[in-house]
Amino acid sequence: MPQQLALMRGVPFVLQTAATATGNGIVVAIPPGFKNHTFHVTGSAGIASGVVTLEHASDPLYAGTWAQVAAPVTPLASTDLVTLATGVYNFVRARISTIVVGGTVTVTVTSD
């Protein structure tokens, strides 16, 4: 198994960087004591469409359908959208489920 990245309390972790294409992004492990999670979905100028789905699973290599942390997020141009989630998650990712058109999207998560 490849090396697994884990969050540090209160330190933002980038799950997607200036992304446009559909894909899972980076999977990060959440330490068991971290229950409050803040996801920032930041759209660049010019975004016309796209969807980011915030997901979690019990295994970083899980090949099935990951569970949604919250409702899918439609990034907006030059805007930082915040999604708050509470729960015990083993692994999270920010999957671009619909291609981003006209700009890029960056997604970060911070947990404690």
What would you call each of these model-derived segments?
Residues 34-41, 85-104:
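Noncatalytic modules at the cell exterior or secretory-pathway interfaces
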Residues 15-32, 44-53, 72-82, 100-104:
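Surface-exposed ligand/attachment interfaces on beta-rich extracellular proteins
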Residues 42, 55-57, 97, 110:
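A generic structural motif
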Residues 11-16, 61-71:
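Surface-exposed loop/edge segments in extracytoplasmic proteins
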Residues 2-5, 28, 32-35:
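Extracellular and organelle-lumenal recognition/adhesion modules and their flexible linkers in secreted
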Residues 8-14, 25, 36-38:
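Intrinsic-disorder/low-complexity, polar/charged segments enriched in Ser/Thr/Lys/Arg/Asp/Glu/Gln
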Residues 1-15, 106-112:
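Short, intrinsically disordered N-terminal pre-domain segments
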Residues 47-63, 107-108:
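Short, surface-exposed beta-strand/strand-loop-strand elements in extracellular ectodomains
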